[in-house]
C-alpha cells in the first residue's frame, strides 16, 4: 500500500529509475488511484491501477465469529483496461457494502461476476 500523500515522491522515483509504468494497489480501497493516475500521466508514466483485496474464505456475507470465516486472504487485482477499472470499482464497492466484516471482503462470486478486464496476481 502506498500513502497517497507520497504519490508524487513515488512517481518521481519511478521516473528517476527510468521505468515507463508503475502500479498502485491500496489494501481494500482505491483512495489513491485518481491522484496517482494524474501524477503518473503528468510525468509520462503509464499508471497501472489496482487493489489488494481481502478474499473471504467462504461467502462475503458470512459474519459468524469463530467459524473461521473471520479470516481473509490477500489478492492483488490490476485493471487491464477501462472495463477492468469499472469492474474493480464494483468489486471494491461491494466489498464495503456487502462484505465488510473487520475488513472489506470479496468472495469468489464477486470475482467471477466482475472478472472481465482484471488481472489477478498469485
Predicted feature descriptions by range:
Residues 1-122:
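Phosphodiester-processing cores and adjacent nucleic acid-binding clamps
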